[in-house]
């Protein structure tokens, strides 16, 4: 599986998921009046205030 791994500050790239990972995630939150979006392989639990979307494809 290949997921985008945009971390907001380095631009959009992609990565091949390791260890048989079958999901990608996108999480977003607001920090110091700026919206932060992070994408990568996996789908984990997040803390309150963070929006998480998980998918099988990009």
Curated annotation (Swiss-Prot):
Disulphide bond pairs: 3-24, 17-41, 43-54
Matching Gene3D superfamilies: CD59
UniProt xrefs under CDD domains: TFP_snake_toxin
SUPFAM superfamilies to which the protein is assigned, alphabetical: Snake toxin-like (SSF57302)
Keywords, alphabetical: Acetylcholine receptor inhibiting toxin, Disulfide bond, Ion channel impairing toxin, Neurotoxin, Postsynaptic neurotoxin, Secreted, Toxin
Compartments it resides in: Secreted
Domain of life: Eukaryota
Molecular function GO labels: acetylcholine receptor inhibitor activity; ion channel regulator activity; toxin activity
Chief location category: secreted
Record-level GO cellular component terms: extracellular region
Organ and tissue specificity: Expressed by the venom gland.
Similarity comment: family membership: Belongs to the three-finger toxin family. Short-chain subfamily. Type I alpha-neurotoxin sub-subfamily.
Function: Binds to muscle nicotinic acetylcholine receptor (nAChR) and inhibit acetylcholine from binding to the receptor, thereby impairing neuromuscular transmission.
The protein's name in its UniProt record: Weak neurotoxin D2B
Organism: Micrurus pyrrhocryptus
Lineage: Eukaryota, Metazoa, Chordata, Craniata, Vertebrata
